[in-house]
Amino acid sequence: MRLKRHFKFLAFTASVAVVVILSAFSFTAMWEDPPIIPGSGVTEIKMLSEWLPSIEGTMLDTEVYIIRGAEEGGRFLLLGGTHPNEPGGTLAAVVFVENVSALSGTVYVIPRSNHSAFTHNDAMEGAPQFFSIELPDGSERVFRFGSRRTNPIAQWPDPTIYLHPTGATLGGGEVSNLNRTFPGRENGYSTEKVAAAIMNLVLEEDIDLVCDLHESSPEYPVNNAIVFHQEAAELAIMTQMMLEIEGIDIRLEESPVNLRGLTHREIGDNSDAYVVLLEVSNPSQGRLRGKTTEELVTEGIDKYYLQASKDGKLFAPYDESGYPLDLRVARHVATIRVLLDSWNMMFPERTIFLSDVPPYEGLVDGLGTYLNPVS
């Protein structure tokens, strides 16, 4: 009898060990970055740690892709992956890295701004770790679906109350949210260090224009919108008007003065750069969604959001076709293109002329067409 119990205990222990080992492999697989394949327009790749050496060799460090034109001009910083559970922002930045060239000016692209947050998922959300996009040759590109917050391995524990550098108080969990920690602290929490590194880049490289790419829940009021620092109001208005001429509806939201830590507020207040943040609707991160699957991430089809739309509960259009990733990336890329067109009209002495920006219709028809195959 005692031997039988001993055998059961050993069998149970072995089963637990197998589960733990398999879970560990799954967890650590998130630490490996899916490749980004730079196009011919990328002239240099640096690491963010160049602007804050203390993050070198940590999971906070991330690539900065530089697209430099033959002619001098303005300097543009494009941020993707501030929130890695908002893949439309990440993929729009990747599309720029893999396709775009500069004729004048310089573009700095950070597709995985909060790199650490790509290495895990939000707890208890049941989200997929990865999603894939098919390319015209039948191959697939794999990307990570991450978290809104910095990995606890890189930053733990969070305080009960987060005292922001401006003196404002926020919920303690916001210290893990990159878009609440700007302008950052070089010797602060890990997330603050990332914000400080990006802020140093803006200041040291004399960045003229910053665009931070996001997605928002369909039921969230700030949706399909340009959020702008007050200094960038005229630029945002011109961009909206030009987009509407192209048939792309987009809202304008001015950055709240008292809401601290956001890119558009803090970079705008602490530098000479014009700063905007773009939002596009994403059903896979909303609270009304059903099961969070890879298909929901890429296709954006959800029966609960369809019902919510019929009930008039959403702030973005939604029908049986869903809100696919192709469309979300297309909206971001088109808005950036028109934003730069508007910039060039307003500041002809600091132009940022780009070539090979994928067209809106082409991206809507298939994002995979504009992603480079992995050799």
Predicted regions and their residues:
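Glycine-rich His-Gly loop
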Residues: 69, 80-84
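Proline/glycine-enriched tight loop/beta-turn segments at coil->beta junctions
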Residues: 68-75
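Active-site/substrate-binding loop(s) of hydrolase catalytic cores
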Residues: 87-88, 103-241
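Short, solvent-exposed loop/turn elements at domain surfaces
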Residues: 74, 87, 285-288
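Di-metal (Zn2+ and/or Mg2+/Mn2+) metal-binding site signature of metallo-dependent hydrolases
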Residues: 83-91
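C-terminal accessory segments enriched in acidic
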Residues: 2-66, 190-209, 213, 218-375
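Short glycine-rich or small-residue beta-strand-to-loop segments that form or flank ligand, phosphate
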Residues: 75-81, 110, 181
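A short, Lys/Arg-enriched amphipathic alpha-helix followed by its capping loop at the start of a domain
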Residues: 92-105
